């Protein structure tokens, strides 16, 4: 009788369970607006097109000692910022180029890859490099641009969140395209 009760209990417990079904894959639905660009209106030695979902942080940082200017373009909805640094060229172009390239190379520790692409806009006298950094690096995109004579601008994209590449990838791609548009629309003021 005990064996019959035990057998009945085992059958009851095992027969009531649902068959395990794997959960379907879920994908984030991230809708980013189509970029709408307007010309920057800041009092800077350069101008560029800005995405309407971005804003320049209130405080533009001027350094009277070396003439450098720091401008932060904030993307609140994407939790990212593009940090721009302008420096006048004063017989120091090689140093400025080396510093910009070294900043990118500092990310090789965490980066899976760093892909650089040359940028040239003869009409506006803008020449530079755009770097796309793959992997869990702190900065996903970096660039520098110069006219080789008077102006030098560098920029880096950083997110407010821990750099988990899979999570920030869609926003990084969107902002990468914005940074490329900044480079393409960049004009030096004489």
Predicted features, each with a name:
Residues 156-190:
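Surface-exposed amphipathic alpha-helical segments
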Residues 12-15:
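C-terminal motif of bacterial Sec signal peptides marking the signal peptidase cleavage site
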Residues 98-154:
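Signature of long, low-cysteine stretches enriched in small and polar/charged residues
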Residues 44-98:
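Secretory pathway targeting signatures of secreted, lumenal, and periplasmic proteins
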Residues 17-23:
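Bacterial lipoprotein signal-peptidase II cleavage site
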Residues 82-90, 142-143, 165-173:
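Second-shell loop/turn segments in exported
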Residues 1-4:
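Positively charged n-region of N-terminal signal peptides that target proteins for export
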Residues 24-45:
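Post-signal peptide N-terminal segment of mature Sec-exported envelope proteins
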């Amino acid at each position: 009788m005990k064996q019959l009760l035990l057998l009945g209990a085992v059958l009851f417990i095992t027969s009531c369970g649902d068959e395990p079904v794997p959960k379907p894959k879920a994908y984030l639905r991230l809708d980013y607006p189509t970029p709408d660009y307007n010309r920057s209106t800041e009092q800077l030695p350069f101008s560029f097109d800005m995405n309407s979902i971005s804003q320049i942080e209130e405080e533009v940082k001027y350094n009277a000692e070396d003439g450098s200017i720091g401008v932060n373009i904030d993307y609140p909805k994407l939790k990212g910022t593009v940090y721009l640094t302008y420096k006048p060229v004063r017989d120091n172009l090689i140093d400025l180029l080396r510093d910009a390239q070294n900043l990118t190379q500092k990310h090789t520790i965490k980066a899976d890859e760093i892909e650089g692409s040359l940028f040239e806009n003869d009409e506006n006298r803008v020449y530079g490099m755009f770097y796309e950094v793959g992997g869990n690096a702190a900065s996903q995109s970096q660039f520098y641009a110069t006219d080789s004579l008077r102006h030098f601008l560098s920029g880096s994209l950083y997110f407010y969140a821990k750099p988990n590449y899979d999570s920030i990838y869609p926003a990084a791609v969107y902002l990468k395209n914005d940074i490329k548009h900044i480079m393409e629309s960049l004009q030096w003021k004489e």
